[in-house]
Amino acid sequence: MDSLLTLPLAGEARVRILQITDTHLFAQKHEALLGVNTWESYQAVLEAIRPHQHEFDLIVATGDLAQDQSSAAYQHFAEGIASFRAPCVWLPGNHDFQPAMYSALQDAGISPAKRVFIGEQWQILLLDSQVFGVPHGELSEFQLEWLERKLADAPERHTLLLLHHHPLPAGCSWLDQHSLRNAGELDTVLAKFPHVKYLLCGHIHQELDLDWNGRRLLATPSTCVQFKPHCSNFTLDTIAPGWRTLELHADGTLTTEVHRLADTRFQPDTASEGY
């Protein structure tokens, strides 16, 4: 938990980050989730990014990398980004199995670090909101105490906080019951540290950009199936898979953009009522 990744980027005016989330890979590459072959959609996303891969200083993978909790699924994830020069850090989602995830990704040379120092101005902290076996999230007392310690010992660093589950309602009642259950406790910790201005999550398979008590909360599309916004019941969207790029600036500001495939072949089974 205390492992640290340091990116010595002194003199850089900005840091570019690639976020990939909710790949939902299987041990068998031919398998599909809700009608979408997740390996093929992941590969299509990576192929769209690849011409620009030299631009990124860091890759962040924000959970649900595997659908079937297999070691092979995590190996496939690592295989996909193996040619990217930027280091990758990760956190678990509700579908992940952490023993297999940790082992397979570490064997592939992917860092288990949950704290990243970027140059002299920024840090990224990755939180584990998984409650194993259920879809909702919660931050343990240990996680909250760890977060408070790390924020307190680097008050001079602008901070980007990563977690899988969304702490604010996304506007989908079926999905919001699977949000971060103790968001109030997280808010209490963050209220002490005004240098935390940005939070980034996955989980909801859609784009989100909200204000949370003066902090900017961002969520990012999945590389496979998409959930339709503002729906009371489980509803799939036909919009293409996506990813997010972020730029961290020395003055503490953040700029970001969501990208989607131009490819329209990854259409889900819209008759599905859940998974």
Explain the meaning of each model-derived region:
Residues 45-58, 136-216, 252-255, 264, ...:
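His/acidic metal-ligating clusters that form di-metal
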Residues 21-41, 67, 97-110, 132-141, ...:
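Acidic/histidine-rich helix-loop elements
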Residues 1-76, 170:
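N-terminal active-site segment of His-dependent metallophosphoesterases
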